[in-house]
């Protein structure tokens, strides 16, 4: 995850360089339930509006939470499917808050409504992310349900009315890139706190729809626009949070943008980006699915590391006998091709390994989703 707005602030208000701090434990994205009221084209969990057998019970979830707390996991992102369909979502969320976790909810927003907004507000989630993949019909087509855009937007508005930090998550593909500028305008019109741009990753239905992955020139155009919008928001003092995910080449592309626009700040930004270190799958980001299987991140559902019913998460996470985990935790990673030769490995860290694995069968092959030109990779 590349926190673009953080580095925009560094451009305008540089802070002293400090020693990098290693997070105590990984951020855990937890798919509590696979059931969902939508069937989105790019869903990595391939969810549907049916019950999936074998999911962790609430007592099992609590036991895992105890282990995560002892392992110093700082953040729980509760996801699905649609997490609001879990019968005990509020009890689980409240327990997580009481234990001191930073707790976020990853929702499609359609089930946030007047009947439950007070319960949601009472939990005091630190953040609620709502997926919007375009304006109006574009979103409805991606979500495969008419009216879902208006329902999701209504959920965001309810969150804003109840002082809950809410944000938009947008997955970029060729089929919805035309609505990107409209979503940025929506951020202004609705005074939304956060914008998260997710590049299409090759997992679940996203793997089946990778032919819709935005072409590289389109991706570059979108990123250029996002850089300028984020800069404008910072210059206006709006301080909206802007984050991108699933393509750590964004950080390198941003550095080249800084070299052109703010050359006097380029070395400072480069050092800050190196301290961040790029892709954190298997290191500072983890996933637990609805069945209790542990994965390096949410797009590795086809590759399990172990199950929390059989071994504690803390034990699974530190086991480097698994070849994928050994490589993800290695520094540098055993990258090949362009990624192995890239001048900016210490910023990107090999980008998203699941795309390489899905396309070539090799964990460590070059990432086919890297949109950088050769002259941007090797200089």
Segments and roles (model prediction):
Residues 279-282:
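Short, small/polar residue-rich loop motifs at catalytic or cofactor-binding pockets
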Residues 1-51, 66-69, 313:
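N-terminal pre-core extensions flanking Radical SAM catalytic domains
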Residues 268-277:
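Short, basic/aromatic recognition patches
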Residues 217-268, 293-343, 348-349:
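C-terminal accessory region of radical SAM enzymes
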Residues 288-289:
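Short, acidic, Ser/Thr-enriched surface-loop or helix-capping motifs
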Residues 333-377:
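Cysteine-cluster motifs in flexible loop/terminal segments that predominantly coordinate metals
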Residues 67-80, 365-379:
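Short Fe-S-cluster ligation motifs
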Residues 58-215:
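Radical SAM/AdoMet-radical enzyme domain recognition
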């Amino acid at each position: 995850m590349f926190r673009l707005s953080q580095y925009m602030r560094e451009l305008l208000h540089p802070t002293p360089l400090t020693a990098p701090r290693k997070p105590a434990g990984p951020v855990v994205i937890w798919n509590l339930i696979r059931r969902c009221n939508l069937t989105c084209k790019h869903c990595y969990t391939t969810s549907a509006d049916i019950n999936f057998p074998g999911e962790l019970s609430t007592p099992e979830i609590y036991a895992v939470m105890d282990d995560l707390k002892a392992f110093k996991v700082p953040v729980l992102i509760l996801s699905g499917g649609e997490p609001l369909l879990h019968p005990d979502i509020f009890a689980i969320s409240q327990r997580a808050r009481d234990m001191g976790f930073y707790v976020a909810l990853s929702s499609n927003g359609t089930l946030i409504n007047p009947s439950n907004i007070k319960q949601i507000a009472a939990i005091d989630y630190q953040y609620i992310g709502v997926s919007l993949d375009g304006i109006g019909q574009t979103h409805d087509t991606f979500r495969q349900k008419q009216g879902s855009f208006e329902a999701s937007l209504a959920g965001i508005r309810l969150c804003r009315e109840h002082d809950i930090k809410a944000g938009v998550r947008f997955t970029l593909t060729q089929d919805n890139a035309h609505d990107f500028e409209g979503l940025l305008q929506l951020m202004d019109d609705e005074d939304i706190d956060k914008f998260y741009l997710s590049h299409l990753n090759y997992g679940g239905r996203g793997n089946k729809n990778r032919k819709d992955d935005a072409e590289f020139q389109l991706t570059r155009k979108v990123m250029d626009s996002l850089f300028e919008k984020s800069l404008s928001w910072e210059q206006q003092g709006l301080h909206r949070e802007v984050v991108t995910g699933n393509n750590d080449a964004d950080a390198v592309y941003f550095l080249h943008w800084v070299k052109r626009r703010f050359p006097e700040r380029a070395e400072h930004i480069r050092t800050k980006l190196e301290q961040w270190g790029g892709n954190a799958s298997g290191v500072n980001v983890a996933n637990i699915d609805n069945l209790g299987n542990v994965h390096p991140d949410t797009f590795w559902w086809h590759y399990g590391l172990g199950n929390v019913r059989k071994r504690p998460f803390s034990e699974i996470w530190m086991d480097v006998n698994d070849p994928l985990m050994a490589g993800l935790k290695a520094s540098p990673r055993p990258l090949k091709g362009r990624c192995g030769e890239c001048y900016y490995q210490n910023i990107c860290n090999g980008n998203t390994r699941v795309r390489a694995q899905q396309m070539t069968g090799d964990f460590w092959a070059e990432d086919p989703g890297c949109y950088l030109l050769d002259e941007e990779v090797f200089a």
